[in-house]
Regions:
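Charged catalytic cores and adjacent phosphate/nucleic-acid-binding surfaces used
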Residues: 1-143
C-alpha cells in the first residue's frame, strides 16, 4: 500500500487514518486542518473506509431529524479477514447492528426514532477484535 503522498510503505503496518481533505491539495497544512476538524476515520486492517451521515463527513455537524441516512463503504486489507459487523451508536448506545461476512461493503442505513442528544457514530468491526474502523462522530447541530 502507499501513503498520502504516494510513497510505498516500508513495513506492513495495518494502522491507518483515512483523512477527508475536502478537495484541498494534500499538504501538511491541509492534513492538520482536517485532523483538527475531526474529519478522520481511524482504522486498523482496512484498505479503504468512507462513512457519511446525511451527506456530511465524519466530525461534521448534521441536523437531527426523524430519519437519518448513513452510508458506509469499506474494504479490508489483504490477509486481514472479513468485515463481521457494523454498529451504529446514538450517543453511547448501540441502536443498530448489522452482522456480515464480507471483504467489502457498500451499504446504506436509515436510522429513525432515536433519542440521541449529542451525536451519532458508526464502527466497522472485523473478525479480529483489533481490526476496526472508527470514524469521528457526526455531531448534532445545536438549536
Amino acid at each position: 500500500s502507499v501513503d498520502l503522498f504516494g510513497f510505498r510503505r516500508i513495513i506492513d503496518n495495518p494502522a491507518a487514518n483515512f483523512i477527508y481533505l475536502n478537495g484541498e491539495t494534500p499538504s501538511r497544512d491541509s492534513v492538520v486542518k482536517a485532523v483538527r476538524a475531526g474529519h478522520v476515520i481511524a482504522a486498523c486492517g482496512f484498505d479503504a473506509a468512507d462513512v457519511t451521515c446525511d451527506g456530511q463527513i465524519p466530525g461534521g455537524e448534521v441536523r437531527k431529524s426523524a430519519s437519518m441516512k448513513l452510508h458506509v463503504t469499506a474494504a479490508m486489507a489483504e490477509n486481514y479477514g472479513n468485515i463481521k459487523e457494523i454498529r451504529i451508536y446514538a450517543d453511547d448506545r448501540i441502536i443498530h447492528r448489522e452482522l456480515l461476512d464480507l471483504n467489502k461493503v457498500d451499504m446504506d442505513f436509515t436510522v429513525s426514532g432515536m433519542d440521541a442528544r449529542y451525536f451519532i457514530r458508526m464502527e466497522i468491526a472485523a473478525e479480529n477484535e483489533h481490526r476496526l474502523a472508527v470514524p469521528t462522530p457526526f455531531y448534532f447541530q445545536r438549536g
